[in-house]
Amino acid sequence: MLLLAVITTKFAEAQSFGNQAITYEELYDDPYAINKLFLHLQPLYADVFATNVNAGFGIGANYYLKDKADFQANFRQAYTRSFDLARDAAIKNQVIMNTPNNFTYFELGGTYHIKDEESDTETKLILYSRKYAKGNRWASHVPEHTVVPSKVRKIIGARAGGFAFDTSIDLKRITADQQVSLVDESGDPFPVQSYYYTNEIVTGGYIGGSMSWIKNMAIKPDKGYGVLVDDFIFTSFLDILIAPSIKLDTVQYRDPNLNNTIRKFAADVVDTKVWGFRLGMEGKYNRELGWAYGAEVGARPGIKGRGFYAMLKISVPVFSTSMNHSREAFGK
């Protein structure tokens, strides 16, 4: 009975505390007053690519040009051969002279703001009270929230840019799937039946559209709670990828049966696909020090039938600045 009374009392206290009306002071609410430059350190990305599954690190950057446009750049590279599956297999089963390349990816692009406007909305904020840290464990396990009026900035954009990536590929499996064979300059087939690999270099561009939502607001409740902030920047996008340049390195084989003569086998018998698509999203915070994430799914240009990919990247930390270092000066 005593235990039941204690639980009932604590529950009543939590309910009473949660039902209290909240008054607050608005500190700021301006989705246009965001930082201009964001620099990302990406300790982790994972790329489930039908051509080559890989994981690694990267760097990225975003720059916002007022309400006119924004620009982004990204570079990614596999950690080591153990996280670059096609390259690792190529080294373990190397029977040719080609050097397997590490997976690398580079992208540079921009978004023109076709429509960039502010509108009224509501923001849901999670409440945290100092009382939660004073043994009120019941309340701490039932997060409360409040909804306050705020502004949101919505951007409809037109995207364009370029990309390039370099990767090792399992040429033996690809030629078997496509039912083609490598032949040398004399028309003789490749003499080795074990696995052999080469490198693929793809260069192209993209064009698409995006939708962004930006909030940049903070309130200070009169008592009981800390400062509540919502400064999230979220972007979703859809792009068409076009790669006019898809290069497969010629396979070079030193044939021991022909006095170690170097024989060359062109890989142009492999079918490629010059276009693809992707659907993605990115999120970050308008803070001097924060974190961000991004995800994409789609099909990359390159080897026909091996373009599907799903990629996730995490940025920690993300540094940002308003790039406003001027100060007012007054004469005495």
Say what each PLM segment does:
Residues 14-38, 119-151, 219-231, 321-332:
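Outer-membrane beta-barrel biogenesis signature
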